[in-house]
Structure formats: structure tokens, C-alpha cells
A protein has these predicted regions:
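Positively charged n-region of N-terminal signal peptides that target proteins for export
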Residues: 1-4
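Beta-strand-rich interaction surfaces with strong enrichment in secreted/lumenal proteins
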Residues: 67-69
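N-terminal targeting signals for Sec/Tat export/insertion, comprising classic cleavable signal peptides
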Residues: 26-57
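An amphipathic, aromatic/His-enriched active-site/gating alpha helix that lines ligand/cofactor pockets
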Residues: 22, 46-65, 74, 83-120, ...
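Solvent-exposed beta-strand motifs enriched in subsets of small alpha/beta binding domains
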Residues: 32, 81-82
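Intrinsic-disorder/low-complexity, polar/charged segments enriched in Ser/Thr/Lys/Arg/Asp/Glu/Gln
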Residues: 25-29, 75-79
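Cleaved targeting-peptide boundary
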Residues: 18-25
Length: 126
């Protein structure tokens, strides 16, 4: 059942990333778990800061980040689906993570959660 749920999520989430531009998108998926004692709201707040920085550096409001949280099951595990309009925007986001602001945001993510898996997908609406 767990594998089926993960498969369904990985099939559906890239479509969510296309909701804004209705064509193609680059979607980066992260599989994460909260560290002990950390509340999801802290991750959400840090992710909002990451998204604002990323949109500014990518020069696009078409960058989006989705947090997929558990409805039934282990509430400490979740997924990020970060959608970019193209590889150029994704590369700009990665470069921004090396800035002082980006390093601080990444350090906060490291304090809040552990991410065990990461994939980059190219998606196209059919």
C-alpha cells in the first residue's frame, strides 16, 4: 500500500507543477522527515522564505513549491515538489542557494528536517 501511495504521488505531483503554465515544467521532488520535536509550521515558514528568494533569483513568479503532507500515517514524513518553468529557472534557484541568504535558508532546513531522496523530473502536459 505504501509503495502504491508513493507511486500515485509521483505520478500526480508533476501535473500540479504545470497548473500555472499549462505546458512544460521541471519538477524537483524531495522526500523528507521532520527532526524530533520540530513542527511542520517551521518548515512551511522556511519554505516560504526559500520560495521568495528563488522567485527573485530565477526572475519568475512561475516557480512554485508544494508540500505534500501525510493525511493518514506517519505525520513526520512529507514531500516537497518544487516546480520551475524551465531548466534556466531551476539552475538560477540552485545558484541562489550558494548566496548568503540561500545558505541561511538551507542551514535552517538542515536544522528542521532530514531529506533522504531527491529527484529532478522534466514534465510535459499531454
Amino acid at each position: 500500500m505504501k509503495k502504491l501511495l508513493i507511486a500515485v504521488v509521483f505520478l500526480i505531483v508533476p501535473v500540479l507543477g504545470l497548473a500555472d503554465n499549462h505546458d512544460t515544467a521541471v519538477v524537483e521532488m524531495w522526500k523528507c522527515e521532520l527532526k524530533e520535536g520540530v513542527e511542520m509550521e517551521k518548515v512551511e515558514a522556511n519554505n516560504k522564505a526559500w520560495l521568495a528568494m528563488t522567485r527573485k533569483n530565477a526572475g519568475s513568479e512561475d516557480v512554485n513549491s508544494y508540500m505534500l503532507t501525510t493525511v493518514v500515517g506517519d505525520q513526520t514524513r512529507f514531500l516537497f515538489a518544487d516546480a520551475f518553468p524551465d531548466m534556466k529557472a531551476w539552475a538560477a534557484a540552485k545558484s541562489a542557494e550558494d548566496s548568503e541568504e540561500g545558505a541561511a535558508i538551507e542551514a535552517m532546513f538542515d536544522e528542521l528536517m532530514e531529506c533522504s531522496d531527491n529527484r529532478l523530473y522534466n514534465s510535459k502536459m499531454q
